[in-house]
Every structure is written in C-alpha cells, then in structure tokens.
A protein has these predicted regions:
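Hydrophobic/aromatic beta-strand elements that line small-molecule binding cavities or substrate pockets
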Residues: 43-45, 89, 99
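Conserved catalytic-core motifs of eukaryotic protein kinase domains, centered on the activation segment
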Residues: 78-80, 103-104
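Double-stranded beta-helix
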Residues: 2-11, 17, 100-129
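A short glycine-rich, His/Asp/Glu-containing loop-to-beta-strand
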Residues: 15-57, 62
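Short, conserved beta-strand element in jelly-roll/cupin
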Residues: 43-46, 58-75, 113-116
C-alpha cells in the first residue's frame, strides 16, 4: 500500500509560476508530489498586466473545487449562466462542465483542488455546447 507523503507549504516561502493560463500565476502546494499525482492543489492569483482570454473550455477531471481567498472572479458555466465568486465563495465544477472566465479582480487569489493531479483541458466553441 502506498502512503501519501506529509507536506507543509508556507506562504512566506512561496513561489508563483506561470501555468495553464497565462493571465494567472500558480503556487504549487506540494500536494501533487505528496499524493503521487493523485491530487493537485495550488493557489492561483491574477498575473499583473495580463488580459484574460475568456476562451470556453472544459477539464477532464474527477473532481474540481475552487475556493476564492481574495478578490472576485466570474465564470459562465454550461447550464448555469454567469456566476460571481467572491472571497469565501466555493464552487464544485463537475467533470467536463463547459465554462469560461468572464472577468476577475486584480487582487484575485483562489485555491484550486483537482483530481487527478494531471488532467486534460480542451478548448470548446462555446459554453452551451
């Protein structure tokens, strides 16, 4: 039986890097390595001076949770319309739900937890399929 590794990630030691979206920066929390790739968790923040694309897409996941730590973000979701998430808001994005970003604040920070740790993202023509 494989045991997950113990990991602690402190903000004071944090490095943010470019990732999936060019208009965001990502801080890896070490969960992917600790779980052998089963889960990824990162803090995402708005990248200064970058414009968001608003490109409709979906993720091939088992589970995806977003919790807003600071600021706000708006998404348009398939079958749900536009949803604004503010500090303290949490959303579970079902596997394969089509969505796109509508906008976000300059001070946006959010926690994202996704299973599996490596997942595919596919661009789609529209949110409504």
């Amino acid at each position: 039986m494989t045991t997950a590794g113990f990991v602690v990630s402190h903000a004071r030691d944090a490095d943010f890097e470019r990732g999936l979206r060019s208009f965001f920066e990502y801080r890896d929390l070490g969960i992917k390595d600790a779980t052998g790739g089963k889960v990824v968790a990162h803090v995402i923040r708005a990248a200064a001076g970058k414009e968001f694309s608003g490109q409709p897409h979906l993720h091939r996941t088992i589970f995806q949770l977003v919790y807003v730590l600071k600021g706000w973000i708006e998404f348009e979701y398939e079958g749900q319309g536009t949803v604004r998430l503010e500090a303290g808001s949490c959303v579970h994005q079902p596997p394969g739900i089509r969505h796109r970003e509508v906008g976000h604040s300059e001070d946006l920070e959010m926690l994202e937890v996704v299973l599996p740790g490596d997942f595919a993202t596919e661009e789609v023509a529209s949110v409504d399929g």
